[in-house]
Regions:
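DNA major-groove recognition helix of helix-turn-helix/homeodomain DNA-binding modules
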Residues: 51-67
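Alpha-helical residues within the helix-turn-helix
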Residues: 26, 30, 60
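A short, Lys/Arg-rich alpha-helix, primarily the initiator
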Residues: 1-21, 27
């Protein structure tokens, strides 16, 4: 996935879960102590610089598990 595809994928999962990006940022702050502003979070998605640990937390907020599956 390139950075644009990652951004679109994450934003789509946020919307499908019934959240706004602002709400996700708020939950990251209140539940995980992540101090990101909405503009910083959006910029990370745009640059493709979202850290894996942040992606795991976002997945948890949205009700997803990230699963690593060995290719066959």
């Amino acid at each position: 996935m390139n950075k644009e595809e990652v951004r679109n994928f994450v934003k789509a999962r946020i919307l499908e879960a019934g959240y706004t990006m602002s709400e996700v940022v708020d939950v990251l702050s209140s539940d995980y102590g992540v101090s990101d502003s909405l503009s910083n979070f959006s910029a990370k998605l745009g640059r493709g610089s979202l850290r894996y640990a942040e992606a795991v937390k976002i997945a948890d907020i949205l009700g997803y598990d990230i699963v690593w599956q060995k290719r066959r």
